[in-house]
Amino acid sequence: MRHILVTGFEPFGGETLNPSWEVVKQLEGMTIDDCRVVTRQLPCVFGESLTLLNSAIDELNPTVVIAVGQAGGRVDITVERVGINVDDARIPDNRGQQPIDVAIVPDGPAAWFSSLPIKAMVAAMREKGIPASVSQTAGTFVCNHVMYGLLHKIRERTNVKGGFIHIPYLPEQAAAHAGAPSMATQTVKAALEIALTVALRQSSDINAVGGATH
Protein backbone atom coordinates (compact mmCIF):
# COMPACT_ATOMS: atom_id res chain seq x y z
CA MET A 1 0.00 0.00 0.00
CA ARG A 2 1.20 3.50 -0.85
CA HIS A 3 1.39 6.25 1.74
CA ILE A 4 0.27 9.84 2.18
CA LEU A 5 2.34 11.68 4.78
CA VAL A 6 0.62 14.49 6.69
CA THR A 7 2.37 16.49 9.38
CA GLY A 8 1.27 18.94 12.07
CA PHE A 9 3.20 20.97 14.62
CA GLU A 10 3.51 21.06 18.37
CA PRO A 11 2.24 24.21 20.14
CA PHE A 12 4.35 27.36 19.98
CA GLY A 13 4.24 31.03 20.87
CA GLY A 14 2.62 30.48 24.25
CA GLU A 15 -0.30 28.40 22.94
CA THR A 16 -1.28 25.21 24.79
CA LEU A 17 -2.30 23.41 21.61
CA ASN A 18 -1.64 23.61 17.90
CA PRO A 19 -4.70 23.12 15.68
CA SER A 20 -2.57 21.55 12.96
CA TRP A 21 -1.69 18.55 15.12
CA GLU A 22 -5.06 18.42 16.87
CA VAL A 23 -6.68 17.86 13.47
CA VAL A 24 -3.93 16.00 11.60
CA LYS A 25 -3.66 13.26 14.22
CA GLN A 26 -7.31 12.39 13.54
CA LEU A 27 -6.39 11.45 9.96
CA GLU A 28 -4.03 8.64 11.02
CA GLY A 29 -4.92 5.38 9.26
CA MET A 30 -7.43 6.94 6.85
CA THR A 31 -7.39 5.34 3.40
CA ILE A 32 -7.93 7.04 0.06
CA ASP A 33 -8.00 4.66 -2.89
CA ASP A 34 -4.90 2.50 -2.33
CA CYS A 35 -3.12 4.97 -0.04
CA ARG A 36 -2.93 5.00 3.75
CA VAL A 37 -2.50 8.25 5.64
CA VAL A 38 0.43 8.35 8.06
CA THR A 39 0.76 11.32 10.40
CA ARG A 40 3.76 12.81 12.18
CA GLN A 41 4.09 15.64 14.67
CA LEU A 42 6.94 18.06 13.97
CA PRO A 43 8.64 20.27 16.56
CA CYS A 44 8.32 24.01 16.06
CA VAL A 45 12.09 24.17 15.76
CA PHE A 46 14.29 25.30 12.90
CA GLY A 47 16.44 22.46 11.58
CA GLU A 48 15.02 19.71 13.78
CA SER A 49 11.62 19.92 12.07
CA LEU A 50 13.19 19.25 8.69
CA THR A 51 15.38 16.45 10.02
CA LEU A 52 12.31 14.59 11.26
CA LEU A 53 10.31 15.34 8.11
CA ASN A 54 13.10 14.14 5.83
CA SER A 55 13.46 10.94 7.85
CA ALA A 56 9.74 10.26 7.51
CA ILE A 57 9.90 10.82 3.74
CA ASP A 58 12.83 8.42 3.44
CA GLU A 59 11.04 5.85 5.60
CA LEU A 60 7.65 5.96 3.89
CA ASN A 61 8.45 7.01 0.31
CA PRO A 62 5.04 8.71 0.21
CA THR A 63 3.04 9.59 -2.88
CA VAL A 64 1.80 12.85 -1.35
CA VAL A 65 3.29 14.94 1.47
CA ILE A 66 1.28 17.76 3.02
CA ALA A 67 2.53 19.75 5.98
CA VAL A 68 -0.08 21.63 7.98
CA GLY A 69 0.48 24.61 10.26
CA GLN A 70 -1.33 27.18 12.37
CA ALA A 71 -1.97 30.65 10.99
CA GLY A 72 -3.73 32.49 13.80
CA GLY A 73 -5.64 35.44 12.39
CA ARG A 74 -6.43 33.91 9.01
CA VAL A 75 -10.11 33.41 8.35
CA ASP A 76 -10.02 30.40 6.05
CA ILE A 77 -8.06 27.34 4.97
CA THR A 78 -5.11 28.67 3.00
CA VAL A 79 -3.24 26.46 0.57
CA GLU A 80 0.26 27.82 0.13
CA ARG A 81 1.67 28.55 -3.31
CA VAL A 82 5.38 29.05 -2.55
CA GLY A 83 8.10 28.53 0.04
CA ILE A 84 11.04 30.95 0.08
CA ASN A 85 14.65 30.24 0.99
CA VAL A 86 14.92 32.37 4.10
CA ASP A 87 14.41 32.05 7.83
CA ASP A 88 13.54 35.41 9.41
CA ALA A 89 12.00 34.66 12.78
CA ARG A 90 9.89 37.34 14.43
CA ILE A 91 9.82 35.22 17.61
CA PRO A 92 12.12 32.44 18.87
CA ASP A 93 11.27 28.84 18.06
CA ASN A 94 10.70 26.27 20.79
CA ARG A 95 14.45 25.88 21.33
CA GLY A 96 15.04 29.59 21.62
CA GLN A 97 16.52 29.94 18.13
CA GLN A 98 15.72 33.13 16.23
CA PRO A 99 17.52 33.12 12.86
CA ILE A 100 17.34 36.37 10.93
CA ASP A 101 17.89 36.47 7.17
CA VAL A 102 19.43 32.99 7.09
CA ALA A 103 19.13 30.73 4.05
CA ILE A 104 17.32 27.46 4.67
CA VAL A 105 19.43 25.74 2.02
CA PRO A 106 22.70 27.57 1.29
CA ASP A 107 23.05 27.99 -2.48
CA GLY A 108 19.50 26.68 -2.94
CA PRO A 109 17.05 28.43 -5.29
CA ALA A 110 15.24 31.50 -4.01
CA ALA A 111 11.93 29.65 -3.89
CA TRP A 112 10.14 26.39 -4.55
CA PHE A 113 6.54 26.27 -5.74
CA SER A 114 4.08 23.75 -4.37
CA SER A 115 3.64 20.70 -6.56
CA LEU A 116 0.10 20.19 -5.30
CA PRO A 117 -2.97 21.10 -7.41
CA ILE A 118 -3.56 24.04 -5.09
CA LYS A 119 -6.39 25.73 -6.99
CA ALA A 120 -8.25 22.47 -7.50
CA MET A 121 -7.95 21.79 -3.78
CA VAL A 122 -9.34 25.21 -2.92
CA ALA A 123 -12.20 24.82 -5.41
CA ALA A 124 -13.15 21.44 -3.99
CA MET A 125 -13.24 22.81 -0.44
CA ARG A 126 -15.39 25.74 -1.52
CA GLU A 127 -17.80 23.39 -3.28
CA LYS A 128 -18.42 21.79 0.11
CA GLY A 129 -19.02 25.16 1.74
CA ILE A 130 -15.63 25.41 3.44
CA PRO A 131 -13.92 28.82 3.23
CA ALA A 132 -10.59 28.39 1.44
CA SER A 133 -8.13 30.33 -0.69
CA VAL A 134 -4.67 30.23 -2.23
CA SER A 135 -2.05 31.98 -0.10
CA GLN A 136 0.93 33.74 -1.61
CA THR A 137 3.13 33.56 1.50
CA ALA A 138 3.83 30.92 4.12
CA GLY A 139 5.64 33.50 6.26
CA THR A 140 9.29 33.26 7.29
CA PHE A 141 8.96 31.18 10.45
CA VAL A 142 9.06 27.39 10.89
CA CYS A 143 6.09 26.77 8.57
CA ASN A 144 7.90 28.30 5.61
CA HIS A 145 11.10 26.55 6.75
CA VAL A 146 9.30 23.21 6.51
CA MET A 147 7.56 24.02 3.22
CA TYR A 148 10.75 25.07 1.48
CA GLY A 149 12.71 22.16 2.93
CA LEU A 150 10.01 19.68 1.94
CA LEU A 151 9.92 20.88 -1.65
CA HIS A 152 13.71 20.90 -1.82
CA LYS A 153 13.76 17.33 -0.49
CA ILE A 154 11.34 16.00 -3.13
CA ARG A 155 12.63 18.12 -6.03
CA GLU A 156 13.96 15.09 -7.92
CA ARG A 157 11.18 12.70 -6.92
CA THR A 158 8.85 13.28 -9.84
CA ASN A 159 6.31 10.80 -8.49
CA VAL A 160 5.84 12.74 -5.24
CA LYS A 161 3.60 15.79 -4.73
CA GLY A 162 4.15 18.09 -1.80
CA GLY A 163 3.10 21.36 -0.25
CA PHE A 164 1.75 23.19 2.77
CA ILE A 165 -1.64 24.19 4.16
CA HIS A 166 -2.27 26.80 6.86
CA ILE A 167 -5.34 26.58 9.07
CA PRO A 168 -6.99 29.11 11.44
CA TYR A 169 -7.21 28.95 15.22
CA LEU A 170 -9.63 26.49 16.76
CA PRO A 171 -12.53 28.11 18.68
CA GLU A 172 -10.97 27.31 22.06
CA GLN A 173 -7.86 29.24 21.02
CA ALA A 174 -9.75 32.18 19.57
CA ALA A 175 -11.54 32.63 22.89
CA ALA A 176 -8.20 33.85 24.28
CA HIS A 177 -7.57 36.19 21.32
CA ALA A 178 -10.28 38.85 21.21
CA GLY A 179 -11.69 39.22 17.72
CA ALA A 180 -9.62 36.42 16.19
CA PRO A 181 -11.37 34.21 13.63
CA SER A 182 -11.55 30.46 14.14
CA MET A 183 -12.74 27.27 12.48
CA ALA A 184 -14.23 24.16 14.06
CA THR A 185 -12.12 21.02 14.27
CA GLN A 186 -14.53 18.95 12.18
CA THR A 187 -14.60 21.59 9.44
CA VAL A 188 -10.81 21.68 9.27
CA LYS A 189 -10.69 17.88 9.23
CA ALA A 190 -13.17 17.77 6.35
CA ALA A 191 -11.09 20.34 4.47
CA LEU A 192 -7.92 18.30 4.89
CA GLU A 193 -9.67 15.12 3.77
CA ILE A 194 -10.78 16.95 0.62
CA ALA A 195 -7.27 18.30 0.09
CA LEU A 196 -5.71 14.85 0.37
CA THR A 197 -8.22 13.30 -2.01
CA VAL A 198 -7.75 16.00 -4.65
CA ALA A 199 -3.97 15.91 -4.28
CA LEU A 200 -3.95 12.16 -4.83
CA ARG A 201 -6.41 12.00 -7.72
CA GLN A 202 -5.78 15.24 -9.64
CA SER A 203 -2.78 14.98 -11.96
CA SER A 204 -2.69 18.68 -12.86
CA ASP A 205 -4.14 21.90 -11.48
CA ILE A 206 -7.14 23.78 -12.81
CA ASN A 207 -6.99 27.18 -14.51
CA ALA A 208 -8.76 29.45 -12.04
CA VAL A 209 -8.21 32.81 -10.40
CA GLY A 210 -6.24 32.46 -7.19
CA GLY A 211 -3.99 35.51 -7.16
CA ALA A 212 -3.84 38.57 -4.95
CA THR A 213 -3.47 42.31 -5.52
CA HIS A 214 -1.28 42.84 -2.46
From Swiss-Prot:
Active-site residue numbers: 80, 143, 166
EC number(s) on file: 3.4.19.3
Gene Ontology MF, one: pyroglutamyl-peptidase activity
PROSITE patterns referenced in this protein's UniProt entry, alphabetically: PYRASE_CYS (PS01334), PYRASE_GLU (PS01333)
The organism's place on the tree of life at top rank: Bacteria
InterPro entries from the UniProt entry: Peptidase_C15 (IPR000816), Peptidase_C15-like (IPR016125), Peptidase_C15-like_sf (IPR036440), PGP-I_bact-type (IPR029762), PGPEP1_Cys_AS (IPR033694), PGPEP1_Glu_AS (IPR033693)
Keywords: Cytoplasm, Hydrolase, Protease, Thiol protease
CDD domains, A to Z: Peptidase_C15
One GO cellular component term: cytosol
Residues of the signal peptide: none
SUPFAM superfamilies: Pyrrolidone carboxyl peptidase (pyroglutamate aminopeptidase)
Subcellular location: Cytoplasm
Biological process, per Gene Ontology: proteolysis
Pfam families assigned to the protein according to its UniProt record, in alphabetical order: Peptidase_C15
Catalysed conversion reaction: Release of an N-terminal pyroglutamyl group from a polypeptide, the second amino acid generally not being Pro
NCBIfam families: PRK13197.1 (NF009676), pyro_pdase (TIGR00504)
Subunit structure: Homotetramer.
Function: Removes 5-oxoproline from various penultimate amino acid residues except L-proline.
The protein, known as: Pyrrolidone-carboxylate peptidase
Species of provenance: Enterobacter sp. (strain 638)
Origin organism lineage: Bacteria, Pseudomonadati, Pseudomonadota, Gammaproteobacteria, Enterobacterales
